[in-house]
Amino acid sequence: MSDYRKLAFVGNVGSGKSTIVRTLSEIEVVDTDRPSTVDIGKELTTIGIDYGRIGLGENMALGLYGVPGQKRFSMLWDHVNRSLWGLAFLIKYSAKPDVDSLLQVIEFFQPVANDTPFVVAVTHADQADDDSLESFCTVFQEILAGNGLPAAVMAIDCTSRDSAMSIPLYINAMHGARGDT
């Protein structure tokens, strides 16, 4: 594979970043999950960048970067943000959409200014009925539109390779529609 690109998965605790990198990667994943010292609803938490890689097409190697979404990890964001091929914001379904986290990611990563295809992926969507999930997604679609982003909001299952692949395939299609090589 002659062409290397970067796809970053950013999101809050429990959104599925480590899981999606493990699900998609064709190599052994470098993960930075460590036991949590506070109650976050799970045993392990990501304290750095998780890394995996997949082939996409005949000539592309896609680096998969799982990055914590909390602002205190912004020094990692700087590293990952250079030359991004695509950016996915993972948000765990809940009764109340976490709008502030999305706005923080948009402000920092500047997907419009950097011309980076951007996707919002709703995880744990199985916890919602259809109407609740649609309302949840609509909130994010309105925010994206208000920020000039022609991005998709999609529900995914981070443990399913077919479902998780919808993110890189969508971003690849966005590049194709723009005539990017």
Name these PLM-found stretches.
Residues 46, 55-60, 79-83, 110-115, ...:
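Conserved catalytic network of the ASCE P-loop NTPase/AAA+ motor domain
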Residues 86-90, 113-125, 145-157:
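Conserved beta-strand/loop subsegment of P-loop NTPase cores
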Residues 128-181:
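Canonical P-loop GTPase G-domain recognition
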Residues 73-95, 109-113:
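Inter-motif core of Ras-like GTPase G domains
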Residues 1-43, 52-56, 62-63:
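Conserved G1/Walker A P-loop phosphate-binding module
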Residues 58-74:
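Switch II (G3) loop of P-loop NTPases
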Residues 83-103, 125-132:
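Conserved Switch II/interswitch segment of TRAFAC-class P-loop GTPases
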Residues 101-107, 134-139:
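Charged helix-capping and loop-helix junction motifs
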